[in-house]
Curated annotation (Swiss-Prot):
Pathway: Secondary metabolite biosynthesis; terpenoid biosynthesis; Mycotoxin biosynthesis. Residues 18-33 have a biased composition (Basic and acidic residues). Part of the gene cluster that mediates the biosynthesis of the neurotoxin verrucosidin, a methylated alpha-pyrone polyketide that inhibits oxidative phosphorylation in mitochondria and thereby causes neurological diseases. The carbon backbone of verrucosidin is synthesized by the HR-PKS verA, and further modified by the other verrucodidin cluster enzymes. Residues 18-45 are annotated as: Disordered. InterPro entries: Verrucosidin_biosynth-assoc. One of its GO terms (biological process) is terpenoid biosynthetic process. This is Verrucosidin biosynthesis cluster protein U3. It comes from the Eukaryota. The gene is verU3. It comes from Penicillium polonicum.
Amino acid sequence: MTNILRLFALVPGSVEQDAERISDRRDRSHEEGMTNPEAQSVLNDAEFGRVDPTGWFPHYKNCVQHFVDYSQHTPQVQSIAAFINIRLPCQRPSESSAPMSESTPSSFVSLRPYIRRLIVTAQDSPTVMQGFFGGDWEAGVGCIYKQERVNYMFTAKSSGWASTKAAYDISPDEETPFLRPLRDPSEDEIRVAEARWSEWLAMEDWMVGARSPW
């Protein structure tokens, strides 16, 4: 009976502590949004979450075409893909015996899994990105590249090593062989991630719409 009473005595304090923690986090998010003059401009950065489809998509298609028709067949790209344990489109099983260009149109190939794997293994140097996706890679996949680098920071911040690795594994046999810290992050890139993280904390506490600190 004494133990039960002690347990009940602890519950109100726990609830109060949780409420204080949530309140503190809300205040912190609000203060960061209001005191950081760069937060508003960062959160309004159109390049991070939105693109002009008419201007961006032709460049993206160029990158897909380069990857499917040319770079995936080069020894350099094949060796990197083997090292980071990800199959190229030409290495994936197909139900059709027709050539890749006929059986799997380039428009059906997603570049995002390759960008993600290059980032988490720190193989995403400009030289490698150009080797995979062509000279137009910054205009074509640059926005995806920025998104996924921030996503990697978020994943590492919100979970441990095993969970982070699992998030980037591709079933059944293309597991991420290793994880490396983000390659050469700039101060601006870190500030963008910090602002986005504060925005996410606000979302967790329903500080959106009229309640948003920004």
